[in-house]
């Protein structure tokens, strides 16, 4: 049973939450669970931005199939190679053999180390500031090494000012049906989970995180779409999560 939600008319949220997990990365307690977020842009070309953990893969593929309809999947952008976002990559390529994998040089090094399937003629390598058009949407890519893995990058969609921020600006905590922070009392419900996530996941890479914040400051951002936690879309909410 599909559970997709619209971020915009042709941008879909395909993520799911795991409330059964006790320790995130076998290290950090998550008493309120955790969400694994993935996004799909349906345009002249279809673009999937990141994937999900194996634990929620069934729901993910149901959501993806429903959102695509009869369309093929043209691109999958990998902002972060950690297994909770790429464990489903091999199955994705099996289901959609014509898909092109978009990433940077380190992304493809990691894919070759993590998987055994052949990615020959299936890749599009991007560098700092490179762009990709899906038709009505233009994406730019910015490297964010060691936030918190060496291959990390973020993706900025120009027309609707959307930052797909990888693990940056995320939080612990499962989502309860709503996907936007402003659908919650976020100043009450999310501060502890946001701070705990930041301090445990990306905060220890202070200089690298500050470098990403400087890049983000130069972008006009209307939406922050992280890989964990709610989507931030109001100016007050975006300022709040960046400040936290």
State each model region's role:
Residues 4-65, 154-157, 161-165:
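Conserved beta-strand hairpin/beta-sheet module of binuclear metal-dependent hydrolase folds
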């Amino acid at each position: 049973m599909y559970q997709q939600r619209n971020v915009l008319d042709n941008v879909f949220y395909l993520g799911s939450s795991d409330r059964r997990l006790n320790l995130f990365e076998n290290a950090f307690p998550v008493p309120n669970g955790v969400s694994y977020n993935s996004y799909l842009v349906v345009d002249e070309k279809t673009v999937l931005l990141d994937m999900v953990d194996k634990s929620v893969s069934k729901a993910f593929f149901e959501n993806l199939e429903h959102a695509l309809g009869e369309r093929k999947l043209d691109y999958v952008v990998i902002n972060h190679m950690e297994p909770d976002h790429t464990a489903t990559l091999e199955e994705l390529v099996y289901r959609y053999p014509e898909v092109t994998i978009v990433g940077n040089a380190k992304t493809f090094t990691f894919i070759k180390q993590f998987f055994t399937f052949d990615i020959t003629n299936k890749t599009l390598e991007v560098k700092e500031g490179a762009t990709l058009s899906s038709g009505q949407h233009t994406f730019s890519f910015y490297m964010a090494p060691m936030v918190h893995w060496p291959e990390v990058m973020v993706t900025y969609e120009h027309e609707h000012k959307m930052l797909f921020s990888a693990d940056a600006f995320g939080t612990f905590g499962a989502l309860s049906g709503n996907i936007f922070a402003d659908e919650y009392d976020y100043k009450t419900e999310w501060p502890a989970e946001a701070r705990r996530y930041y301090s445990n996941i990306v905060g220890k890479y202070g200089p690298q995180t500050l470098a990403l914040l400087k890049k983000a400051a130069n972008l006009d951002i209307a939406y922050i779409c992280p890989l964990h936690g709610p989507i931030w879309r109001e100016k007050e909410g975006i300022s709040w999560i960046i400040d936290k």
